[in-house]
Design a protein with these regions (language model features):
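Cap/insert and terminal regions of metallo-dependent hydrolase folds
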Residues: 172-259
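DG-centered beta-turn motif at the end of beta-strands
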Residues: 168-170
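Binuclear metal-dependent hydrolase catalytic cores
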Residues: 1-166, 176-177, 240-264
Length: 264
């Protein structure tokens, strides 16, 4: 497949959307990332940031969607299915645990009298087993690993056209996690919702700290570290200041911003 591979940050706010002039640089819409090459797109989660993917998906003939879990901030973008090209081949991939909940969860979320549109999912009819690489198409593989998070979530270990990308979003740091899968990845996206000082009040909430992300990066040495899932009330100025502190701990660190594009 010709063309460059790029990652687009369509939403990187954690837990809920926020609005206002103090949230314009990093964005207030919730998790949605898009990997794109030529006329193919791989969508990672469908938070409210999915609407920002509309133009990216417009020319795609094939779209794969990976859903880490069914919490609102990762699926509310599915309120408007017109974001997906009408003629594109659309497939959804979820973990074996989430698969069993997929139809029930979405039918409960998008149903009368709360929402007038009943979305029809074209979900792959085979659940994806934990820790078993699945080929989505030639050159694209994903491995789901269980993430420490209330109700469960997934770490994504992705091989996309020879690039190794790991997504630890909605992830609480855990010594038992197999860090070896992350070694020397091209990009590590990490849940940095809290600071180390804030974390003790949020143990078992299913999220980590940007400092833990930097410590992990120093152990596994990714080419780039991107901190995401920003705390809802964290302003642009606060995030900029934390980003500078993160660079002191791991020079290749940055904080995700809505509209950011990373080319591999």
């Amino acid at each position: 497949m010709k063309g460059e591979l790029s990652l687009h940050i369509c939403g990187c706010r954690g837990s809920r959307s926020v609005f206002g002039p103090e949230f314009t640089e990093f964005g207030g819409q919730t998790t949605c990332f898009v990997l794109k090459k030529a006329n193919y797109a791989l969508v990672l989660d469908c938070g409210t940031g999915l609407d920002n993917a509309r133009d990216l998906l417009a020319g795609c003939s094939a779209v794969d969607v990976v859903v880490t879990h069914w919490h609102y901030d990762h699926v509310m973008g599915l309120m408007d299915w017109s974001v997906f090209p009408a003629g594109a081949k659309l497939r959804f991939f979820v973990s074996s645990d989430a698969y069993n909940l997929s139809f029930d969860a979405l039918s409960q979320l998008f149903r009368h009298p709360f929402w007038p549109v009943d979305p029809t999912l074209r979900v792959v009819r085979q659940p994806v087993k934990w820790e078993c690489p699945v080929s989505l198409r030639p050159g694209v593989k994903v491995t789901f690993l269980p993430a420490p998070h209330p109700d469960g979530s997934s770490v994504l270990d992705l091989s996309v056209f020879d690039k190794h990308i790991c997504v630890l979003c909605d992830f609480e740091h855990n010594r038992e996690f197999p860090e070896e899968i992350l070694h020397n990845c091209d990009l590590l996206l990490y849940d940095g919702m809290y600071t180390d000082d804030e974390y003790p009040a949020h143990v078992n909430w299913g999220h980590s700290t940007w400092q833990e992300g930097c410590r992990l990066a120093n152990r596994v040495e990714p080419a780039r570290l991107l901190i995401t899932h920003h705390e809802p009330r964290r302003t642009d100025s606060q995030l900029r200041a934390l980003e500078q502190e993160a660079k002191k701990l791991f020079p290749a660190a940055a904080f995700a911003r809505a509209g950011m594009k990373i080319t591999f």
